[in-house]
Amino acid sequence: MKPFMDKDFLLSTETAKTLYHDYAAQVPIIDYHCHINPEEIAKDRSFDTITQVWLGGDHYKWRQMRSNGIDEKYITGDASDIEKFEKWAETLQKAIGNPLYHWSHLELQRYFDYYGTLSAKTSEEVFKLCNEKLSQPEMSVRGLIKESNVDTICTTDDPIDSLEWHKAIAKDSTFDVKVLPAWRPDKAMNLEKPDYLDYLAKLESVSGVKIASFAGLMEALKVRLEFFNSMGCKVSDHALSYVMYKPATEEEIEAIFAKRLAGGTISEMEELQFKTAFMVSVGREYNRLGWVMQLHYGTKRDNNVFRFNQLGADTGFDCINTEGSSAELANFLNALNSSDELPKTIIYSLNPTDNAAIGTVLGCFQDSTAVGKIQQGSAWWFNDNKTGMIDQMTSLANLGLLANFVGMLTDSRSFLSYTRHEYFRRILCELIGNWVENGEYPNDIEFLGQMVQDISYYNTKRYFGF
């Protein structure tokens, strides 16, 4: 029997062990998509308890605690930190096969030097140990980032954000990790939302552009795009239920937007037409600026309306959406490509059955402007586990060039989540190691080592231009 999560965790062959320890583990981390708060980096926040770090905003953990019958008081409510931690420990012990079990113990090992197991029996001991560690100066936010060997972080930011904390970090010569903004304009696109006009007023204010038309909206966004670009932004991100393509004329789009400005009701088709025009318009801007466009889709959000009204968005009540088709995705990309304005694009679907469809779409739009110009994103959210990662990378290898893959990101709100890069790298090396030891690929360790370093780090650095 193998020891629990030892140095060769997830590595079953000698090739995998060599590739991980000698190559993948040696390169830094670029976390090009996450949801951490740049203010906490700028102020170098310290945490009082492990509960604050682990359970303060992690809806992955909250979902499992609810599945274990834990009262909301101990999840998002007013229970004490030790009570919440004990309830999480009770839950984690049952999470066999869940990536949270591995992630949590990787974090305990790497940041707290704890190589035991977290359970109901050990929860008090682990709580005290972690809190003692967190009281040390090197366990501040910046210390954790440096300890994790991170060299670049891209946060997630709205077009109206001031980016004041990014400015402060960039001016601080004592911290050499790049913390760059990433453009997330969902609120400017989602005209069906009840607070849409309020948002437009804020966008008008920060851009200095009157938004009385769709053309005006695009001009206001262009002003903000230029500002983000001046702050080092190189990537956009879009959260979509699915990638739609319902084209309309300029006159029709202006009429839809005018109706919404006047407080009118927008039909479902009008919403899709507007969003299509929006995505094509901003896609052209990304190409002009040399940015990467990320498309995250396949999500049905806020399904539990009762809890949404209590707790708000991003609290653990989302699921996979099966709407949409690869045809509309291809048509959207083709609309940009037809005018030679298709930017580098990373495509993520929350629905794992989309893997092969995405893999075939990629091959339709590759060209010589970039290696792997159109990418399939790493297994995301509900697929961010051992099975999901293996399935995504195997599908990508079957249909494209795995060696050109831009690899992993945390998509996290926690400063301890950089161990997810380690998790990914171990799984990557195990996958490739098995192929080699099964005689399916030559045992050229020099080339293989460079490949896993490329997927872990260098492909990303080149692709984004960091």
From Swiss-Prot:
Q: What EC numbers are recorded for this enzyme?
A: 5.3.1.12
- GO MF annotation list: glucuronate isomerase activity
Keywords attached to this Swiss-Prot or TrEMBL record, sorted alphabetically, are: Isomerase
What EC class is this?
Answer: isomerase
- GO BP term, example: D-galacturonate catabolic process
Q: Spell out the HAMAP family in the cross-references.
A: UxaC
Can you name this protein?
Uronate isomerase
The protein's gene is named: uxaC
